[in-house]
Amino acid sequence: DGILKAKTEMFEQAMPGAQIIVNGDDDKLITLKSRTPKPTFFGLDSSLDLYAEHVENLGLGGSRCDFVTKAGRFTALIPIPGHHMVYNALAGTAVGLALGLTLREIQAGIEALKPVSGRNHLIHTEKWDILDDCYNANPVSMAASLDVLTNALGRKVAILGDMGELGENEKLLHYNVGCHAADDHIDAIFAVGELSRELVKGVQAKDPEGRLICRHFAAKAELLTAL
């Protein structure tokens, strides 16, 4: 609720005629539909102002879907993996329409997307495919990255570190990520850092039989030696 309050401060500061774009699939944000100025809502629900349908998961190759807007519809390939990227593309579509771009221009922009270092950046090497999503990680982004990893072929190894600035619930949030990781059918989980001990506890709680390889390291040097 505190985060919602902070995010809605923009309504109070918005200039007349301002356009505010929010995720309509978010249970908290959808409560803003009666606010002024009226937001534009995006998501996967067909009742929203713009939405995506027929979403096709292409694994590490990204996803393809149809974008439905009041100005028309188009199909686009999102070249960055992860279901959450559909929401990012929807948000970009809403902004593009607000700025007067054509649907063709928006489609071209989506298909030209390139990841930045540390944000869902797929690195191909002779031996491994590495998904680099380490910049300023939070529980939502880490869970999303783990979901992306499940789409990879071959053996899947997650190397996870501490997430900072999570407040008084930091241990529980790390524990929950561990539970999520155990459910994602990853072959091995290596965790490094003090808070990541809780992450390992979450994995072990969901995998009491030890099906997963799960190890904790106090420092990066120990992890590198093990790798």
Residues of each region from the PLM?
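Glycine-rich phosphate/diphosphate-binding loops that line cofactor/substrate pockets in enzymes
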Residues: 148-157, 227
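Glycine-rich phosphate/pyrophosphate-binding beta-alpha loops
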Residues: 116-118, 134-144
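Residue-level marker for buried hydrophobic side chains located in beta-strands
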Residues: 130, 158-159
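Charged helix-capping and loop-helix junction motifs
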Residues: 2-6, 143-146, 170-181
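Acidic, Mg2+-coordinating active-site environments of NTP-dependent enzymes
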Residues: 1-129, 154, 179-182, 186-188, ...
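Short, intrinsically disordered, charge-balanced linker/junction segments flanking boundaries
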Residues: 1, 221-227
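Short acidic-hydrophobic, aromatic-tinged amphipathic segments that line or gate anion-handling sites
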Residues: 212-223
